[in-house]
Amino acid sequence: NCEGKAILVLGVSYRQDVGDTRHSPAETLVRTLEIRGAQVTSYDPFVQYWKEMDRSLPAELPAAEGVDAVVFATPHREFQVLDVPKWLGDSCPVILDTVNVMTDKCRKLCRKAGIQVESVGRGDGL
């Protein structure tokens, strides 16, 4: 149930390290989450204005405080080197890595900190 949940989507471009949002799977994801009542914030280091969604995006990575879930939707290099446990601080959202951007070490550190990390397409339970 997404009703009233705060969800942060990281990456809205259609592929890694570009600012082109045409045909991005993130658009479908964000629209679906919003239809289901979620409050979605999106961030992409290569996109300042998301034309297809008619919205501006923050210039800096938003704080994770108050976020119920974080979705990695584009594997930008900025996200690959992000110290996720440090960035999250005391926050403990669910993390969904849809693009295999988190390293095994990062996944393990998050889980050790009590953060639920889920992945798509890995097949190894990490």
Which residues does each predicted region cover?
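Structural/interface elements that position substrates and couple domains in central-metabolism enzymes
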Residues: 1-126
